[in-house]
Amino acid sequence: MSSMFKQISKSLFYEKATMSVLFFLSCLGSFMYFFVQVSIDGNLKHLAYNKTNGLLINSSQKELLIALHSNQILAATFLIIFSVIAAFAFYMFFLKYYRNHMKEIGCYKAFGRSNKQIIAVMFFINSSLSFIAFIVGFILGWICSDVLLQLYRSSFDIESLHKGILPSNLAIGFLFIVVLSGIMAIVPYYKFLKFDISSLLRNFPEEHQNKWIVFISNKLSNAVPTKYRRSFRIALRKPLAVSLLFLSVGCFTVLSIMSMSLHFSSQYIYETQTLGRSYKYDIQFENYQPYHPLEEDSTFYLRSNVKISWKGNEINQQAIGFHKKTNLFQFYTLDHKKLFLPKEKEVYINEALSELYGIRQNDYIEVNIKHKIYKLKVAAIVGNAENKTIYLSEPQLASMLSIKESSYNGILSNTVPKQYENKSIITEKERLAYLQKNNVSNKISAVINQLLGCIIGCLLLYLVILLNFQDCTRNILILNMLGYSANSINKMLISIYKPLLNVAFIIMVSLSVIVCQFIQKSLSIKTGDYIPFQTNLFIIGGIWLLLNLIYHLIHCRFNNNIAKIQNAGQTKKYIL
């Protein structure tokens, strides 16, 4: 048993590059999960302890509690996505590994080793590798969680924050990172259980090509240019390899588009939240104030919390009504056209309501104010609306609130009258600082996601293309011994993957955009923070260039490996 363990370990770690990629994927999944979860569990435990002992929780702690619950969803999302990607990579590698080492498997079985023993060894080796990655990721996540704690301190003005991890969450991470990876290492082996020892030793299991695969590959290859026809037919007769290529391109494209969208959305939010505003002070009152004349550089407004009902959704919003048209706050549509104040029985909504819930212009929505429901027409979608805010006419909002017309509880102004100096005042500087802080925070998150997206996408793509190339190693060496030139072999077996890669990109890019829109929409609804989807042709073009660059780098590396095999005189080892 020990000799088989040593031999399998040696053959596995001979693939240094691939095993390093698998280790890094497991480590990354563990790191991202614990990076978020460690900053959650300690604080949730602390807040729960305060509640149990009857201690009061202030407003900042309540906001922190909401953020922690939202981040729990984020941590679970990280764990699931990274675990699925890692499991996919492990499955691909070990499927190729078993195919390329059938003779060794046949030898183990010929010497009396059972399938259960082989599976146990494979599971143990792979789980051990994943366990080391799990521990490394946990330690790094614990250390780096200080970054999130610092963000909590700056966002919620709370100094007493704690790290921690619940045993249940530690066990969940272990199951997804370690156990799942071990299982995915042995799942491909079950395909080889049906082969007898003689078939394995001959290295040519008696598999019959599915007639439908042959038929489809022949039909599809006839549709491509003549110079690619033979190569295309050869590639399509390996449907799993082609499927994995398409899937990896899809994952790479989704991760890349998502990361770039997150980066640009933070700037988009900052720009829309500063557009059309030329006031310096926002003076707010707890109670409604009676009308009295204001300075020319001031205007008052009325605000109230409301609920919008739309297709079964109850959406909390803030309603604002301005007393008169003013240059202090100019409404703009999504295409940057100026808007006047809404009319009676009309409402202006923000972009988030339109994008997340599908409310369109001229639709009718139900607005619940003080337990009374009003049906209003959506007259426009305001591109520069305040977050979670809708706009009505001031007389209409006053009527809904059953207060006198021209009453107000807020003033926008460029000066602060002396009688209001002790009121709640949000200055332009404070407002811009808050937006900038959120912008920087969002950009940091976007850069992290961008780097992770590119790293994971590149690694996954690298793994798939390299494994497909390695699958051709034996055929390349045989053709070389038969006298075919390197250029001819390249055109026949390797170059076809470049057009396949580009076809996969063209097919998957539209689907990737839809997936990214769905993910960002779901995150926006779950967290309550609107994340507008942002992409353009330059981003798509950049992803395509990066995709082809990765292909050429892998191609060069593979050609160098083939040359090393030939120069070292190891051709027979790969053929026999």
Indicate residue ranges for each PLM-predicted region:
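N-terminal Sec/SRP start-transfer signal
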Residues: 1-30, 97, 123, 127, ...
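Peri-transmembrane interface segments
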Residues: 13-24, 35-81, 96-99, 121, ...
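C-terminal membrane-exit region of the final transmembrane helix in multipass inner-membrane proteins
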Residues: 33, 37, 93, 171-207, ...
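Short helix-loop junctions at transmembrane helix boundaries
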Residues: 42-43, 70-74, 138-172, 503-569
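Hydrophobic alpha-helical segments
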Residues: 65, 69-70, 102-209
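Interfacial "coupling" helices/loops that link adjacent transmembrane helices in transporter permeases
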Residues: 88-128, 460-499, 569-570
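Juxtamembrane segments of multi-pass membrane proteins
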Residues: 227-352, 361-363, 367-368
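Small-residue transmembrane helix packing/gating motifs
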Residues: 381-415
